[in-house]
């Protein structure tokens, strides 16, 4: 088992009833389980943590010319190399109705892992490179893993509970 705490985060369409959102989220968790059952992180979450965070993912539309926000968010998460479980509901025209992914405490525990509070350049938007690098490397042993964690923290700030 890992020393991390995990939560299963997921996005669902805004226009489903709360019970339908929960059911679709559950379907996606089953898909995640099918693909990642033997992963250490999944086992830690399933045996010890068991927390769901269901977020409003906006619209769903599989049409390539006008994809829904849920579909676009899924693409973003996959492009970051984050393992996902996704579900498309046959009774809703096979539209994407949920996707889920595990998040560890470095993303959601802002008390133990605070946001960047270092210096900024004169434009007040760009963090001082050395300060920022030192801050982000507290999250992981590799820069790639630290960048993934920082990306998830930034990504999840955009959502509200479903």
Regions found by a protein language model. Give the residues of each.
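Glycine- and Gly-Pro-enriched alpha-helical subdomains that act as flexible
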Residues: 2-38
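Active-site pocket-lining segment
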Residues: 37-51
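Short amphipathic beta-strand starts and helix->beta connectors
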Residues: 33-41, 79-86
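Sterically constrained small-residue positions within well-ordered secondary structures
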Residues: 1, 44, 90-92
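Short basic, glycine-rich beta-strand/loop surfaces that mediate nucleic-acid
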Residues: 9-11, 48-66, 70-162
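Residue-identity detector for glutamine
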Residues: 20-24, 43-44, 80, 95
């Amino acid at each position: 088992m890992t020393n991390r705490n995990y939560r299963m985060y997921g996005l669902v369409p805004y226009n489903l009833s709360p019970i339908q959102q929960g059911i679709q989220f559950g379907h996606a968790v089953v898909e995640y389980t099918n693909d990642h059952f033997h992963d250490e992180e999944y086992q830690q979450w399933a045996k010890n943590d068991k927390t769901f965070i269901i977020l409003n993912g906006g619209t769903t539309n599989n049409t390539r010319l006008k994809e829904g926000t849920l579909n676009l968010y899924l693409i973003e998460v996959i492009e970051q190399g984050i393992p996902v479980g996704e579900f498309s509901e046959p009774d809703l025209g096979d539209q994407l109705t949920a996707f889920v992914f595990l998040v560890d405490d470095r993303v959601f525990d802002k008390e133990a892992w605070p946001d960047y509070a270092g210096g900024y350049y004169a434009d007040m938007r760009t963090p001082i490179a050395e300060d920022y690098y030192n801050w982000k490397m507290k999250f992981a042993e590799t820069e790639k893993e630290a960048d993934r964690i920082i990306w998830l923290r930034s990504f999840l700030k955009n959502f509200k509970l479903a």
